[in-house]
Every structure is written in structure tokens, then in C-alpha cells.
Amino acid sequence: VLSSADKNNIKATWDKIGSHAGEYGAEALERTFISFPTTKTYFPHFDLSHGSAQVKAHGKKVADALTLAVGHLEDLPNALSALSDLHAYKLRVDPVNFKLLSHCLLVTLACHHPAEFTPAVHSALDKFFSAVSTVLTSKYR
């Protein structure tokens, strides 16, 4: 459960990320593909090389979904319902991959914003990514 302090930290961090969200999303995807090669199996039709336009475009989709979630912290299930359906019924993404991407998102944000990445912010973002992952996998059951 996200506390009010967590929500404030998430919103403040996302405000600082601003126009870099798509760039960070792509970087986190690249980190995921390099660190956890099995995640590549969901993207057989993508050029997964560094700087690929397809990875950048998907990174922007990830960032846009997270931006949507930040704007709906009080009701993540409704805000992410369509994405949950997509990942559960059409894409059939193994739920563990959300944890792997979440970890890579945390690393990416920490690298770009080390001064702002306090323990409280780290904890809030970790809880947020976990909550988003839970919603995205909720329809698997």
C-alpha cells in the first residue's frame, strides 16, 4: 500500500523525470534485455540493438503507461485495466518479467538522478512499480 509520503515522492520524482521518461523507459528495456536475455523472447520481431527505434518506441510506451499510473495512484486497477488485459490475454507475458523490468527502471532512475534517489524515494518507487506489476498480472489468475 502506498502511503501519502510514497505518493508525494512518486509524483515529485516523475515531475523531475519529465520529458526524459521515454528515454529512461528505453534505457531500462535495454538493461533488461542485456541483464535478463530470456526477456528478449517476447520481442522476436524487434531490432534489439542499442539505440533501436523499436526499443525506443516501446520504452516510450512503458513510460507513458507509468505516467498514466502516476496520475491515477488512487485507482491503478481501472487506469491500467486495458494494459492488464493486453499482457494477460494477448501477449501472455510471464509475470516475473515485470519484476525484472521494475528493477532495471530503478537502476536507470538511480543512475540519472543520484542526488534525488534517497532511500525514501527508492522505497516509494519500488512499491509503485510493484503495485503496477500486481495490477498488470492480476488477470492472470
Curated annotation (Swiss-Prot):
Residue spans making up a coiled coil are none
N6-succinyllysine sites (modified residues): K7, K11, K16, K40
Q: Name one GO cellular component term.
A: blood microparticle
Residues given in the record as heme b binding sites? H87
Q: What positions does the domain Globin occupy?
A: 1-141
Amino-acid positions noted as binding O2 in the UniProt annotation, renumbered to this chain: H58
Entry keyword annotation includes Metal-binding = yes
PTM-bearing positions, type Phosphotyrosine: Y24
Q: Which residues carry this modification: Phosphothreonine?
A: T108, T134, T137
Task: Report the residues modified as N6-acetyllysine.
Answer: K16
Q: Which residues carry this modification: Phosphoserine?
A: S3, S35, S49, S102, S138
Q: In which tissues is it expressed?
A: Red blood cells.
| Single biological process term from Gene Ontology | hydrogen peroxide catabolic process
Do you know which CDD domains this protein is assigned to?
Answer: Hb-alpha-like (cd08927)
One family name in Pfam for this protein: Globin
- State the UniProt keywords alphabetically: Acetylation, Heme, Iron, Metal-binding, Oxygen transport, Phosphoprotein, Transport
Any one GO MF term held by the record is: peroxidase activity
Q: How does it assemble?
A: Heterotetramer of two alpha chains and two beta chains.
| Biological role | Involved in oxygen transport from the lung to the various peripheral tissues.
Q: What is this protein called?
A: Hemoglobin subunit alpha
Q: Tell me which species this is from.
A: Paguma larvata (Masked palm civet)
Organismal lineage:
Eukaryota, Metazoa, Chordata, Craniata, Vertebrata
